Each structure stands twice: as C-alpha cells, then as structure tokens.
C-alpha cells in the first residue's frame, strides 16, 4: 500500500497550518524593554531608552537598527528621510519609543503609518514614561482592527 503524503513512517511530522509556530522575537523585545524600564525607571529622555534598549537587544544577539529612515513616494517625488523610526529589530519589528506622561492616538497612528511605509507587519509603541511599562506597551499589527472598533 502506497501513501501519498508524509507521515510518521518516513520520520516527517505534519504541521497544522492553522497553528503557526509562535515567533519568539516579540517576547524577547518586550522582556528586554521591561528589564530596561525596571533598571532605569521612568522619567529619562526618549533617546536614553533608545540607546540602552538597542544595546540590550544586541547583547541578546538581535540585529537592531536605530533611527531608520522611513521613505515616502508620491507622484514621482521621493522623500528618503521624511520620518525616522526609532528602532527596527531583526528587519521585521518596528519599535517607536516615547517617554511621556500619556500617549495619544496620534502616536499609534504614527506607528501604523511607519509600518505601511516600511512594508512591515508588527510594531510596538513603548512608553517609557509610564510608571509601569506594562501599562505603556501597545502592540500594533498592520491590517488588524481591534474588535471594539469594528463596524457591527
């Protein structure tokens, strides 16, 4: 009897396409950001958190780019450095850092715009000005609309 698919007999495991393997990168980023905030506390300038977080992520073996140009093209015009993203980790996750008392909707929209312009899917808005960083983390996924804002 012949088998048309891979199975346990040939040592291959089948994967469930509905359950993708979780990406550990976001967890490493958040754990590192939480540690930086615990060590430094709130109240410093955004630039300090950017430098320290980039360094800590690099020490964990991740590729980190700082102040990454966000290009814009419009009707033949090319703006190569119209904006700058604070950090891009592993060429796939954008980090926008703030050190403010409270973030506003415009900050979230900024991250979403950067994701679109850079062709990335996942970003985090990290507010190091929050007393507890866990309260200052916003995960932003391009194309995801939170249930509370969907039309019914």
Question: What are these model-derived regions, one by one?
Answer:
Residues 1-21, 145-152:
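Intrinsic disorder/low-complexity segments
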Residues 58-75:
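A short acidic/basic microdomain associated with nuclease active sites
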Residues 94, 98-151:
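Nucleic-acid nuclease catalytic cores
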Residues 78-80, 84-95:
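Active-site beta-strand-loop-beta-strand hairpin of nuclease catalytic cores
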Residues 22-27, 42-46, 50, 54:
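Nuclease catalytic cores
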Residues 74-80, 133-134:
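Acidic pyrophosphate-coordinating catalytic loop
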Residues 29-38:
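A short, surface-exposed helix-loop junction/capping segment
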């Amino acid at each position: 009897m012949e088998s048309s698919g891979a199975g346990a007999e040939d040592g291959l495991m089948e994967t469930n396409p509905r359950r993708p393997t979780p990406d550990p990168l976001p967890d490493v980023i958040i754990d590192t950001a939480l540690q930086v905030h615990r060590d430094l506390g709130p109240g410093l300038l955004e630039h300090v958190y950017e430098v320290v977080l980039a360094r800590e992520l690099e020490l964990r073996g991740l590729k980190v780019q700082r102040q990454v140009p966000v290009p814009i093209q419009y009707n033949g015009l090319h703006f190569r450095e119209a904006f700058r993203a604070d950090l891009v980790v592993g060429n796939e996750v954008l980090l926008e850092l703030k050190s403010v008392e409270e973030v506003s909707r415009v900050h979230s929209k900024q991250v979403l715009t950067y994701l679109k312009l850079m062709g990335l899917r996942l970003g985090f808005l990290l507010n190091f000005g929050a007393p507890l960083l866990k309260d200052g983390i916003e995960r932003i996924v391009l194309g995801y609309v939170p249930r509370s804002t969907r039309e019914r």
